[in-house]
Amino acid sequence: MSSASLLWCHSGVSTVRFGERIFTLVAGDLLFAPEEAQVADDSQGLVLNIRFETLNIMGPARRIHLGHVWNDRLTFEYSRSLFGKETLSPDIARLFTDRVPTPPLPAPRKARAVAQVLVSNPADQTSLEEFAEIQGVSARTLQRQFLKSTGYSFSEWRAAQRVCVAASLLAHDFSISVVANLVGFAATSSLTRAFRRHTGATPSTFTTGQIGMGSAGHPPRIPATTTFAEAHQDQQLWIYSGTATVTTPGYCRFMGQGDMVTIPAGTQTRIDVAAGSIAFPVPVGLDEWGMDLTRVVAVNNQQPKPLTILEQSEWSKLSEELLNTPVPVQM
């Protein structure tokens, strides 16, 4: 299991701690922490701890605000983790991927030395001619080295580097005017022009309410899923929203929102959840009439993952058995 944490604040306000850092999450926040994070006991919000063997997210802690429109999509991702899936969905991992590429460093030693100065301090105002004199080459030679090895002229490369850094700062709540000054643009209008040229968007697209390196937009649709799994101990399956079908040798049941069915320990089961639907495994003994997402989170925080995904050979055998064993469908 990855030691990193991915936390979705479904509702309310919560305090999250990891290492020496403290984050306050509000409804609609998604937090990635490179180490295990803990939700404070006195938090008033509902936080879903989305745990996978592999998150495919790298780098420092980041909090991004998606808004309540992403609630169902992230709740579905939480359900995937409880069903034993090993990897975070690519469309969620991509939310943390930089959408403004860092310009490539030039290969020639003189040009690379200049580029490294600008990486360390994007606001540096040294001109091409001054850099050339420092490096002991002509301005024309330095310009040619940048253009040939990166595809950018010197001024274009500097602007691209500034835009890359600016996008990161904007995603961390710095104002556009402050960011323009920090990365070396004389005015916000200069930053805006550079953004349009290098990203096709304005700086406001990268501010709070959007995602780090670009707008998150509307959440992707919840896909239909099929899971072949085995319960470690007696489990129940609760349909949070939509519909699902549970099939075992000799048994098949179609279920709707709010329904619950028991999966006996050791039973190999096929679970088909319809598109736009969400289902959760929960311990035996819970009453379907009192079930809600808060209870799902509480009980699953106290137990290991309840289901194990079958190996391909196992689910292939189960599929053949289900196909050749006609059973009545229960509604």
From Swiss-Prot:
InterPro entries: Homeodomain-like_sf (IPR009057), HTH_AraC (IPR018060), HTH_AraC-typ_CS (IPR018062), RmlC_Cupin_sf (IPR011051)
Residue ranges of domain HTH araC/xylS-type in the record: 112-209
Coiled coil (UniProt feature): none
Pfam families (UniProt xref): HTH_18
A single MF term (Gene Ontology): sequence-specific DNA binding
BP term (GO), one: regulation of DNA-templated transcription
Membrane-spanning parts: none
UniProt keyword terms in alphabetical order: DNA-binding, Repressor, Transcription, Transcription regulation
DNA-binding region: 129-150, 176-199
Description of the deletion phenotype: Under iron limitation, the ripA deletion mutant shows a 2-fold higher aconitase activity and a higher mRNA level for the acn, catA, leuCD, narKGHJI, sdhCAB and pta genes.
Keyword Cell membrane: no
Induction context: Repressed by DtxR under iron excess.
PANTHER family membership: HTH-TYPE TRANSCRIPTIONAL REGULATOR NIMR (PTHR11019), TRANSCRIPTIONAL REGULATOR-RELATED (PTHR11019:SF159)
Task performed by this protein: Under iron limitation, RipA negatively controls the expression of the acn (aconitase), catA (catechol 1,2 dioxygenase), leuCD (isopropylmalate dehydratase), narKGHJI (nitrite/nitrate transporter and nitrate reductase), sdhCAB (succinate dehydrogenase), pta (phosphotransacetylase) and katA (catalase) genes. Binds to the consensus sequence in the promoter region.
Name of the protein in its database record: HTH-type transcriptional regulator RipA
Source organism per UniProt: Corynebacterium glutamicum (strain ATCC 13032 / DSM 20300 / JCM 1318 / BCRC 11384 / CCUG 27702 / LMG 3730 / NBRC 12168 / NCIMB 10025 / NRRL B-2784 / 534)
